[in-house]
């Protein structure tokens, strides 16, 4: 679901951040749920705007999610509330951000999200609800 372009951009940003951060304390706190919500809304609105300008979905997702990824990588050391203080790897973080961005974008511009993506997101959501009920 997530483009290779995003992963390449995110990897470059993470590398640049680590180079710039040398000599600084390595201990960074996980993003709070409130911060994650803010980053999610910003990335979703950006995705929606890119779609309205005619950018294809995968590129729009990359555009929207890059800032989110950068904030979590740079400010929070790849740590999110659900990671229990441990840094996520690049793939896990980018996949989670893609999912969160897409789900939030469904609230703002559902008409600009491909039907196939909507169907996959709904199926994943239904599966999580089903698993949570057991």
Give short role names for the model-derived ranges.
Residues 16-18:
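N-terminal signal peptide c-region/cleavage motif recognized by signal peptidases
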Residues 24, 63-134:
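Compact alpha-helical subdomains of small soluble proteins
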Residues 5, 29, 58-59, 96-100:
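Alpha-helical interaction segments
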Residues 4-14:
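Sec-dependent N-terminal signal peptides
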């Amino acid at each position: 679901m997530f483009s290779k372009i995003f992963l390449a951009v995110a990897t470059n940003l993470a590398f640049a951040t680590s180079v710039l951060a040398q000599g600084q304390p390595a201990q960074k706190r996980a993003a709070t749920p409130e911060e994650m919500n803010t980053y999610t809304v910003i990335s979703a609105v950006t995705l929606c705007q890119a779609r309205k300008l005619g950018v294809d979905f995968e590129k729009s997702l990359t555009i929207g999610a890059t800032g989110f990824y950068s904030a979590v990588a740079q400010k929070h050391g790849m740590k999110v509330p659900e990671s229990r203080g441990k840094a996520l790897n690049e793939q896990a973080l980018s996949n989670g951000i893609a999912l969160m961005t897409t789900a939030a974008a469904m609230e703002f511009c559902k008409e600009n999200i491909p039907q196939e993506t909507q169907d996959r997101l709904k199926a994943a959501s239904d599966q999580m609800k089903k698993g949570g009920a057991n």
